[in-house]
Design a protein with these regions (language model features):
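Non-heme Fe(II) oxygenase metal-center motifs and adjacent flexible, charged/small-residue loops
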Residues: 1-299
Length: 299
Protein backbone atom coordinates (compact mmCIF):
# COMPACT_ATOMS: atom_id res chain seq x y z
CA UNK A 1 0.00 0.00 0.00
CA UNK A 2 0.89 3.70 -0.12
CA UNK A 3 3.32 5.12 2.44
CA UNK A 4 1.68 8.53 2.15
CA UNK A 5 5.00 10.05 1.06
CA UNK A 6 3.74 11.80 -2.06
CA UNK A 7 6.14 11.92 -4.96
CA UNK A 8 8.30 9.14 -3.51
CA UNK A 9 5.84 6.29 -3.14
CA UNK A 10 6.70 3.56 -5.66
CA UNK A 11 3.22 2.11 -5.32
CA UNK A 12 1.69 5.34 -6.69
CA UNK A 13 3.97 5.27 -9.73
CA UNK A 14 4.30 1.59 -10.52
CA UNK A 15 1.42 -0.39 -9.00
CA UNK A 16 1.48 -3.00 -11.79
CA UNK A 17 5.26 -3.46 -11.37
CA UNK A 18 4.87 -3.92 -7.62
CA UNK A 19 2.08 -6.43 -8.14
CA UNK A 20 4.41 -8.30 -10.48
CA UNK A 21 7.31 -8.22 -8.00
CA UNK A 22 5.00 -9.58 -5.30
CA UNK A 23 4.08 -12.38 -7.68
CA UNK A 24 0.36 -11.83 -7.30
CA UNK A 25 -2.07 -11.65 -10.22
CA UNK A 26 -5.55 -10.40 -9.37
CA UNK A 27 -7.37 -11.66 -12.49
CA UNK A 28 -7.22 -14.95 -14.40
CA UNK A 29 -7.85 -15.31 -18.13
CA UNK A 30 -10.59 -17.77 -19.09
CA UNK A 31 -10.01 -19.23 -22.61
CA UNK A 32 -13.61 -20.46 -22.88
CA UNK A 33 -15.14 -16.98 -22.49
CA UNK A 34 -12.24 -14.65 -23.39
CA UNK A 35 -12.79 -12.87 -20.07
CA UNK A 36 -10.31 -11.90 -17.36
CA UNK A 37 -12.09 -12.87 -14.13
CA UNK A 38 -11.32 -11.47 -10.69
CA UNK A 39 -9.53 -13.99 -8.48
CA UNK A 40 -11.49 -15.41 -5.56
CA UNK A 41 -9.35 -13.91 -2.80
CA UNK A 42 -8.80 -10.53 -4.46
CA UNK A 43 -10.89 -7.37 -4.15
CA UNK A 44 -12.07 -8.09 -7.72
CA UNK A 45 -13.83 -11.40 -6.97
CA UNK A 46 -17.11 -11.50 -8.91
CA UNK A 47 -15.95 -8.94 -11.48
CA UNK A 48 -14.63 -9.48 -15.01
CA UNK A 49 -13.72 -7.70 -18.24
CA UNK A 50 -13.11 -8.80 -21.86
CA UNK A 51 -9.43 -9.61 -22.48
CA UNK A 52 -8.97 -9.85 -26.26
CA UNK A 53 -5.89 -10.97 -28.16
CA UNK A 54 -5.06 -14.28 -26.43
CA UNK A 55 -5.52 -17.54 -28.33
CA UNK A 56 -4.68 -20.85 -26.63
CA UNK A 57 -4.44 -24.37 -28.08
CA UNK A 58 -3.93 -27.15 -25.54
CA UNK A 59 -1.99 -30.31 -26.48
CA UNK A 60 -0.70 -28.66 -29.64
CA UNK A 61 1.90 -31.42 -29.97
CA UNK A 62 2.12 -34.96 -28.54
CA UNK A 63 4.37 -36.10 -25.67
CA UNK A 64 6.56 -37.98 -28.14
CA UNK A 65 6.94 -34.88 -30.33
CA UNK A 66 7.79 -32.78 -27.27
CA UNK A 67 10.43 -35.29 -26.16
CA UNK A 68 12.01 -35.37 -29.63
CA UNK A 69 12.05 -31.56 -29.99
CA UNK A 70 13.75 -30.99 -26.62
CA UNK A 71 16.26 -33.77 -27.28
CA UNK A 72 17.21 -32.12 -30.59
CA UNK A 73 17.52 -28.71 -28.90
CA UNK A 74 19.79 -30.13 -26.20
CA UNK A 75 22.26 -31.34 -28.85
CA UNK A 76 23.14 -27.66 -29.40
CA UNK A 77 24.64 -25.30 -26.83
CA UNK A 78 22.38 -23.13 -24.69
CA UNK A 79 23.81 -19.63 -24.20
CA UNK A 80 23.39 -17.81 -20.86
CA UNK A 81 20.70 -15.12 -20.99
CA UNK A 82 19.15 -12.63 -18.53
CA UNK A 83 17.26 -13.45 -15.31
CA UNK A 84 18.51 -17.04 -15.04
CA UNK A 85 17.41 -18.09 -18.51
CA UNK A 86 19.38 -19.81 -21.28
CA UNK A 87 18.63 -19.31 -24.97
CA UNK A 88 19.11 -20.48 -28.54
CA UNK A 89 18.42 -17.92 -31.28
CA UNK A 90 17.58 -18.59 -34.91
CA UNK A 91 17.26 -15.21 -36.60
CA UNK A 92 18.99 -12.16 -38.07
CA UNK A 93 21.42 -10.08 -36.02
CA UNK A 94 19.40 -7.07 -34.82
CA UNK A 95 20.15 -3.80 -33.05
CA UNK A 96 16.67 -2.71 -32.00
CA UNK A 97 17.78 0.65 -30.56
CA UNK A 98 19.46 1.72 -33.80
CA UNK A 99 16.90 -0.16 -35.93
CA UNK A 100 19.56 -2.00 -37.88
CA UNK A 101 19.79 -5.62 -38.89
CA UNK A 102 21.80 -7.96 -41.07
CA UNK A 103 21.26 -11.55 -42.09
CA UNK A 104 24.77 -12.25 -40.75
CA UNK A 105 25.15 -15.88 -39.72
CA UNK A 106 21.41 -16.58 -39.93
CA UNK A 107 20.93 -19.94 -41.64
CA UNK A 108 17.21 -20.44 -41.07
CA UNK A 109 14.86 -22.02 -38.55
CA UNK A 110 15.88 -25.50 -37.30
CA UNK A 111 14.73 -28.57 -39.23
CA UNK A 112 12.53 -29.79 -36.35
CA UNK A 113 10.39 -26.64 -36.61
CA UNK A 114 9.12 -27.49 -40.09
CA UNK A 115 6.43 -29.78 -38.65
CA UNK A 116 5.47 -27.31 -35.88
CA UNK A 117 5.01 -24.52 -38.45
CA UNK A 118 2.98 -26.84 -40.71
CA UNK A 119 0.65 -27.67 -37.79
CA UNK A 120 0.10 -23.96 -37.12
CA UNK A 121 -1.71 -23.68 -40.45
CA UNK A 122 -4.68 -25.52 -38.90
CA UNK A 123 -5.24 -22.50 -36.58
CA UNK A 124 -7.46 -19.86 -38.21
CA UNK A 125 -5.86 -17.16 -36.06
CA UNK A 126 -2.49 -18.02 -37.67
CA UNK A 127 -3.67 -17.69 -41.26
CA UNK A 128 -0.75 -16.41 -43.35
CA UNK A 129 1.69 -16.62 -40.43
CA UNK A 130 5.26 -16.93 -41.77
CA UNK A 131 7.85 -17.17 -38.97
CA UNK A 132 11.09 -15.37 -39.68
CA UNK A 133 12.70 -15.88 -36.27
CA UNK A 134 12.70 -18.51 -33.54
CA UNK A 135 13.94 -18.14 -29.98
CA UNK A 136 14.20 -21.10 -27.59
CA UNK A 137 14.34 -20.20 -23.89
CA UNK A 138 15.26 -22.59 -21.09
CA UNK A 139 13.93 -21.88 -17.57
CA UNK A 140 14.75 -23.80 -14.37
CA UNK A 141 13.89 -23.09 -10.71
CA UNK A 142 17.52 -23.85 -9.73
CA UNK A 143 18.69 -20.79 -11.70
CA UNK A 144 15.79 -18.66 -10.45
CA UNK A 145 14.65 -18.23 -14.05
CA UNK A 146 12.02 -15.57 -14.78
CA UNK A 147 11.30 -12.85 -17.31
CA UNK A 148 10.38 -9.27 -16.40
CA UNK A 149 7.25 -7.63 -17.87
CA UNK A 150 8.08 -6.43 -21.37
CA UNK A 151 6.76 -5.70 -24.85
CA UNK A 152 8.32 -7.51 -27.79
CA UNK A 153 9.74 -5.11 -30.39
CA UNK A 154 7.31 -3.94 -33.08
CA UNK A 155 9.69 -2.30 -35.57
CA UNK A 156 10.81 -5.67 -36.96
CA UNK A 157 8.34 -8.15 -35.47
CA UNK A 158 4.73 -8.25 -36.60
CA UNK A 159 1.37 -8.53 -34.88
CA UNK A 160 1.34 -12.16 -33.76
CA UNK A 161 3.69 -13.64 -31.16
CA UNK A 162 3.46 -17.44 -31.06
CA UNK A 163 4.90 -19.53 -28.21
CA UNK A 164 4.95 -23.27 -27.59
CA UNK A 165 5.22 -24.16 -23.89
CA UNK A 166 7.21 -27.37 -23.26
CA UNK A 167 8.13 -29.67 -20.32
CA UNK A 168 6.06 -27.97 -17.59
CA UNK A 169 3.10 -25.68 -17.05
CA UNK A 170 3.59 -22.00 -16.24
CA UNK A 171 1.70 -18.72 -15.96
CA UNK A 172 2.09 -15.71 -18.25
CA UNK A 173 1.44 -12.58 -16.15
CA UNK A 174 0.02 -9.64 -18.12
CA UNK A 175 0.39 -6.09 -16.79
CA UNK A 176 -0.40 -2.63 -18.16
CA UNK A 177 1.35 0.71 -17.59
CA UNK A 178 -1.20 2.90 -19.37
CA UNK A 179 -3.14 5.68 -17.65
CA UNK A 180 -6.42 4.18 -18.92
CA UNK A 181 -9.14 2.71 -16.80
CA UNK A 182 -10.77 -0.68 -17.26
CA UNK A 183 -14.53 -1.13 -16.97
CA UNK A 184 -15.37 -4.18 -14.90
CA UNK A 185 -18.76 -5.85 -15.01
CA UNK A 186 -20.23 -8.22 -12.43
CA UNK A 187 -20.38 -11.87 -13.44
CA UNK A 188 -23.27 -14.30 -13.23
CA UNK A 189 -22.68 -17.54 -11.36
CA UNK A 190 -22.01 -19.24 -14.75
CA UNK A 191 -19.10 -16.85 -15.27
CA UNK A 192 -20.79 -14.73 -17.93
CA UNK A 193 -20.84 -10.94 -17.78
CA UNK A 194 -24.03 -9.44 -16.40
CA UNK A 195 -25.65 -6.88 -18.71
CA UNK A 196 -25.18 -3.31 -17.37
CA UNK A 197 -27.78 -2.40 -14.78
CA UNK A 198 -29.15 -5.93 -14.45
CA UNK A 199 -30.49 -7.41 -11.24
CA UNK A 200 -27.74 -9.60 -9.93
CA UNK A 201 -26.71 -11.50 -6.85
CA UNK A 202 -23.00 -12.14 -7.22
CA UNK A 203 -19.86 -12.02 -5.12
CA UNK A 204 -19.29 -8.63 -6.77
CA UNK A 205 -22.09 -7.26 -4.56
CA UNK A 206 -20.16 -8.36 -1.51
CA UNK A 207 -16.83 -7.03 -2.79
CA UNK A 208 -17.87 -3.71 -4.31
CA UNK A 209 -17.64 -1.84 -1.03
CA UNK A 210 -20.93 -0.10 -1.88
CA UNK A 211 -24.50 -1.21 -1.66
CA UNK A 212 -26.04 -1.65 -5.08
CA UNK A 213 -29.24 0.38 -5.43
CA UNK A 214 -32.18 -2.01 -5.38
CA UNK A 215 -29.90 -4.86 -6.48
CA UNK A 216 -28.67 -3.05 -9.61
CA UNK A 217 -24.89 -3.18 -9.72
CA UNK A 218 -23.30 -0.54 -11.96
CA UNK A 219 -20.05 -1.25 -13.84
CA UNK A 220 -16.88 -0.48 -11.90
CA UNK A 221 -13.91 1.51 -13.24
CA UNK A 222 -10.40 0.64 -12.07
CA UNK A 223 -6.99 1.98 -13.20
CA UNK A 224 -5.31 -0.38 -15.68
CA UNK A 225 -2.13 -0.19 -13.58
CA UNK A 226 -3.85 -1.97 -10.70
CA UNK A 227 -4.76 -5.00 -12.81
CA UNK A 228 -2.60 -8.04 -13.59
CA UNK A 229 -4.00 -10.99 -15.53
CA UNK A 230 -2.73 -14.57 -15.21
CA UNK A 231 -2.79 -16.59 -18.43
CA UNK A 232 -2.28 -20.25 -17.51
CA UNK A 233 -0.15 -22.15 -20.02
CA UNK A 234 -0.46 -25.95 -19.77
CA UNK A 235 2.41 -28.17 -20.86
CA UNK A 236 2.52 -28.55 -24.69
CA UNK A 237 0.10 -25.63 -25.18
CA UNK A 238 0.49 -23.09 -27.99
CA UNK A 239 -0.33 -19.47 -27.14
CA UNK A 240 -0.76 -16.56 -29.57
CA UNK A 241 -0.65 -12.93 -28.40
CA UNK A 242 -2.00 -10.28 -30.77
CA UNK A 243 -3.90 -6.97 -30.68
CA UNK A 244 -4.20 -5.54 -27.16
CA UNK A 245 -2.46 -8.55 -25.60
CA UNK A 246 0.55 -7.75 -27.81
CA UNK A 247 0.61 -3.94 -27.87
CA UNK A 248 -1.18 -2.76 -24.70
CA UNK A 249 -0.30 -5.43 -22.13
CA UNK A 250 3.24 -6.41 -21.17
CA UNK A 251 3.92 -10.10 -20.55
CA UNK A 252 6.27 -11.67 -18.00
CA UNK A 253 6.76 -14.80 -15.87
CA UNK A 254 7.30 -14.87 -12.10
CA UNK A 255 10.03 -17.05 -10.60
CA UNK A 256 7.43 -18.85 -8.51
CA UNK A 257 5.70 -20.02 -11.70
CA UNK A 258 8.78 -21.96 -12.82
CA UNK A 259 8.43 -25.16 -10.79
CA UNK A 260 10.38 -27.51 -13.08
CA UNK A 261 12.47 -27.16 -16.23
CA UNK A 262 10.46 -25.28 -18.85
CA UNK A 263 11.39 -24.72 -22.49
CA UNK A 264 9.58 -22.09 -24.53
CA UNK A 265 9.77 -21.89 -28.33
CA UNK A 266 8.73 -18.45 -29.61
CA UNK A 267 8.12 -17.68 -33.28
CA UNK A 268 7.85 -14.15 -34.68
CA UNK A 269 6.62 -12.82 -38.02
CA UNK A 270 7.73 -9.69 -39.90
CA UNK A 271 6.15 -6.28 -39.35
CA UNK A 272 4.40 -4.40 -42.19
CA UNK A 273 7.61 -2.44 -42.81
CA UNK A 274 9.37 -5.66 -43.88
CA UNK A 275 6.38 -7.24 -45.66
CA UNK A 276 4.86 -6.80 -49.15
CA UNK A 277 4.53 -3.09 -49.93
CA UNK A 278 6.69 -2.07 -46.95
CA UNK A 279 9.83 0.06 -46.98
CA UNK A 280 12.11 -2.94 -46.38
CA UNK A 281 10.13 -5.49 -48.40
CA UNK A 282 13.19 -6.88 -50.23
CA UNK A 283 15.14 -7.50 -47.03
CA UNK A 284 12.05 -9.12 -45.53
CA UNK A 285 11.79 -11.48 -48.52
CA UNK A 286 15.45 -12.44 -48.16
CA UNK A 287 15.06 -13.17 -44.43
CA UNK A 288 11.92 -15.27 -44.98
CA UNK A 289 13.62 -17.30 -47.68
CA UNK A 290 16.47 -18.11 -45.30
CA UNK A 291 14.13 -18.79 -42.35
CA UNK A 292 11.84 -21.18 -44.22
CA UNK A 293 14.71 -23.27 -45.59
CA UNK A 294 14.60 -25.00 -42.15
CA UNK A 295 18.34 -25.69 -42.28
CA UNK A 296 19.31 -23.43 -39.40
CA UNK A 297 21.77 -23.65 -36.55
CA UNK A 298 21.62 -21.37 -33.48
CA UNK A 299 23.34 -18.02 -34.14
Amino acid sequence: GCSGNKGKCLYCFFPSLLLFLQGEDNFTYCPATGLAKGNEHSEFAGWAFPFPGVFLVEEFISEDEECEIVELMDRDDWKPSQSGRKKQDYGPKVNFKKQRLKAGGFTGLPSFSRQIVAQMKACSVLSGFLPVEQCNLDYTPERGSAIDPHFDDWWLWGERLVSLNLLSKTVLSMSCDSEDTIQLSPTFSKGELSPPGSLTQTSACRNSGKEAIEGVLPPRLVPSKEVTVAVHLPRRALVVLQGDARYKWKHGIHRKHIEHRRVCVTFRELSAEFSAGGRHEELGKELLEIALSFQGRPV
